[in-house]
Amino acid sequence: MTKLADMKCEACQADAPKVTDSELAELIRLIPDWGVEVRDGIMQLERVYKFKNFKLAMEFTNKLAELAEEEFHHPGILTEWGKVTVTWWSHSVKGLHRNDFIMASKTDQLLG
């Protein structure tokens, strides 16, 4: 299987399939630091990244913004002193699509 971080997001429309339960179980293992949250009935991926200060958190946020623009897929981002909370889900399908797992993996690579 190709590494998630090496994959590209595909255009996603309202009729695109959400990940199945078996796909979810397989994909979540590839991004072990991420959790699945359900908000307003919508499944989402979420991770909190820790930093030594606000400046480093903001630098990470800006790198993530650039990545999101490159891939045309945008997360929820909460930047605070010493941490950034990133939430991925596909608004168009109101849940999780393979793109969200690709972007979670790419987000992890921003730390390296």
Swiss-Prot record:
CDD domains: PCD_DCoH_subfamily_a
EC number in record: 4.2.1.96
InterPro entries for this protein: PCD_sf, Pterin-4-alpha-carb_dehyd, Pterin_deHydtase
UniProt protein name: Putative pterin-4-alpha-carbinolamine dehydratase
Keywords assigned: Lyase
Superkingdom of the organism of origin: Bacteria
Keyword Transcription: no
